[in-house]
Design a protein with these regions (language model features):
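Sec-dependent N-terminal signal peptides
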Residues: 4-14
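Short, basic/aromatic beta-hairpin or loop at an interaction surface
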Residues: 18-30, 70-90, 172-186
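Alpha/propeptide regions of enzymes that mature by internal proteolysis
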Residues: 20-29, 35-51, 56, 87, ...
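Extended, compositionally biased flexible segments
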Residues: 57-58, 62-102, 114
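Short, Lys/Arg- and Gly-enriched loop/turn segments at beta-strand edges
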Residues: 57-69, 117-127, 214-224, 314-316
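Intrinsically disordered, low-complexity linker/loop segments enriched in Gly/Pro
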Residues: 90-94, 100, 115-201
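Conserved mixed alpha/beta catalytic, RNA-binding, or beta-rich assembly cores of soluble enzyme
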Residues: 165-275, 286
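Long, compositionally biased
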Residues: 318-336
Length: 336
């Protein structure tokens, strides 16, 4: 039994949970930044559950792409009409938050349990910007509307192509260290943020090292689905509502975000250089196997080579991402 899972079981049985709902409004929006100096829009206790609404898109761009005006959420129009440009950050993501978790402090770990994700609108969109992985080949911008069949859980790409929907939040993060200031929401980092990791669907858990008092969690960049790499710079972008439970661990320490699914443990590496991101991820994987599974470093290195996939998370956020998928089934025969 690993430390991750032990923590989750203990926390679930020991912590009474209050439940909250946080709607997205101009007052509860963090536009394009993560920041240790941000004022919390909600403060909760460790163990509490929050339903959080998010929005995505630019109303004018969506209408120009052919989306019927009546499908654009009033909340999205209100945000664009009322959030002053001077209060917007250097990035473009519409993030709901920040939420402070009482008692979280630098050196702790924030566990974010993603309990549920709901598709809020009947469409997604893909915007082919001028900053994608192949921007030198595809220099012209384009936005494509992708109708969503939420009953059948598919997106109609067009031409008879249907895409299974696997909604997740591209950006889930907390404040970076105070010295970093107001950081752009686009590059992910030690604070998590714009990880764009498609494995983080409902039923999974994200672990983030805490760098500021209260942690200051923000979430947005909803995706109905995505391919690893996110090569044209966007996924199937859409508005989502998520249900999250927050648990603070004072006696757990991480250097980089990690995650857990029902079937895998996930380690991550982030760096502007893809090779360096892969190196960080491989070292994180070895550290996990040594510290949690009690393997020797040599065996951990070998197991990473023979049984664990290192996948490209995304190539387009400035800071590139690589994540390792560590199957739990590998350890089924280990003595507890």
């Amino acid at each position: 039994m690993t430390r991750f899972l032990v923590f989750m079981i203990v926390a679930a049985t020991a912590l009474p949970a209050a439940e909250y709902k946080l709607k997205v409004t101009p007052e509860t929006l963090a536009w394009g930044y993560y920041w240790a100096g941000a004022k919390p829009v909600l403060t909760v206790q460790s163990g509490d559950v929050v339903e959080i609404q998010t929005v995505s898109g630019n109303p004018d761009n969506l209408e120009r792409a052919g989306l019927p005006p009546e499908q654009i959420q009033p909340e999205l129009r209100k945000i664009y009409a009322e959030v002053p440009k001077e209060s917007r950050g250097p990035g473009g993501h519409l993030l709901t938050g920040p939420i402070a978790i009482e008692g979280a402090r630098p050196g702790d770990v924030l566990e974010v349990r993603i309990r549920a994700i709901r598709l809020d609108v009947p469409y997604a969109y893909n915007s082919m910007g001028r900053a994608g992985f192949l921007a030198d080949v595809f220099a012209q911008g384009r936005t494509k509307i992708i109708p969503l069949d939420r009953e059948r859980n598919i997106g109609h790409f067009g031409g008879g192509i249907d895409i299974p929907l696997k909604p997740f939040f591209g950006s889930m993060g907390i404040a970076p260290p105070e010295a970093a200031g107001k950081v752009n929401s686009a590059p992910p980092g030690i604070h998590a943020g714009n990880l764009d990791n498609k494995e983080l669907v409902a039923g999974t858990t994200l672990f983030i090292p805490v760098h500021a008092a209260g942690a200051l969690f923000e979430v947005g960049d909803g995706h109905a689905g995505m391919g690893n790499g996110e090569v044209d710079i966007t996924a199937m972008e859409t508005s989502l509502t998520g249900v999250f439970q927050f648990v603070v661990h004072h006696d757990m320490h991480l250097s980089w975000p990690r995650a857990e699914t029902p079937t895998h443990y996930i380690t991550m590496g982030l760096d502007p250089d893809l090779t360096q991101a892969a190196r960080i991820c491989a070292l994180e994987t070895i550290d996990f196997l040594v510290n949690e599974m009690k393997l020797s470093r040599e065996d951990a290195y070998a197991l990473t080579s023979v049984a664990i996939d290192l996948d490209i998370t995304q190539l387009v956020d400035g800071t590139k991402g690589v994540h390792a998928m560590i199957p739990k089934s590998l350890f089924a025969g280990m003595k507890k």
